[in-house]
């Protein structure tokens, strides 16, 4: 089956991948654009994992001010070079992250920042809530672990569902940007301010 330039163009527009990568993915999937997107995403995420150990010391600080000037969020997002920091894709990622922080008010950037004592306290509360349910201990532990995942999703930025597209987690958004831009990207820190809150 021959692959048309229109198919390659459509795939490039949807993924940002190179022409040869798009053509190969389309050839491998017999022209199925959706399957080709999946292949390119998997390839990109594998490449992103390799880049995660590289130093990200450049970047930008993005500010989002909610209409009405009652909520503001500031996010520092780092990358490896100022060239990438100046791209529209990187600027959009930083803006989307700041908007997300303003909307969801997370407490931590990643799981590693959450104090172990806070996680254990939450586990204990969840165990107590389920102790009288009459369920076996191993089932209670599975319920508790599932709820701990939900707890992380409420307080950890990278574990949250993106407000503009709940089918995507923030960490996946960052991984996609790493794959597309070809550099390690790290959400370093954030702050959120709201009028009248402590």
From Swiss-Prot:
Pfam families: EF_TS. Keywords: Cytoplasm, Elongation factor, Protein biosynthesis. One of its GO terms (cellular component) is cytoplasm. InterPro entries: EF-Ts_dimer_sf, Transl_elong_EFTs/EF1B, Transl_elong_EFTs/EF1B_dimer, Transl_elong_Ts_CS, UBA-like_sf. GO terms for molecular function: translation elongation factor activity. It is found in: Cytoplasm. Belongs to the EF-Ts family. Associates with the EF-Tu.GDP complex and induces the exchange of GDP to GTP. It remains bound to the aminoacyl-tRNA.EF-Tu.GTP complex up to the GTP hydrolysis stage on the ribosome. NCBIfam families: tsf. This is Elongation factor Ts.
């Amino acid at each position: 089956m021959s692959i048309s330039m229109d198919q390659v163009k459509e795939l490039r527009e949807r993924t940002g991948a190179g022409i040869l990568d798009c053509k190969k993915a389309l050839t491998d999937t017999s022209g199925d654009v959706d399957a080709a997107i999946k292949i390119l995403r998997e390839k990109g995420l594998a490449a992103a994992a390799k880049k995660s150990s590289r130093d990200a010391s450049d970047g930008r600080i993005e500010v989002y001010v909610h209409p009405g000037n009652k909520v503001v969020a500031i996010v520092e997002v780092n990358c490896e070079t100022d060239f990438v920091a100046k791209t529209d894709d990187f600027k959009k990622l930083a803006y989307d992250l700041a908007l997300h922080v303003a909307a969801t008010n997370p407490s931590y950037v990643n799981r590693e920042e959450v104090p172990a004592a806070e996680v254990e306290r939450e586990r204990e509360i969840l165990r107590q809530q389920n102790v009288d349910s009459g369920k076996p201990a191993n089932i209670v532990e599975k319920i508790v672990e599932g709820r701990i995942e939900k707890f992380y999703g409420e307080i950890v930025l990278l574990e949250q569902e993106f407000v503009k597209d709940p089918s995507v987690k923030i960490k996946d958004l960052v991984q996609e940007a790493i794959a597309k831009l070809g550099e390690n990207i790290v959400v370093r820190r954030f702050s959120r301010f709201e009028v009248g809150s402590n």
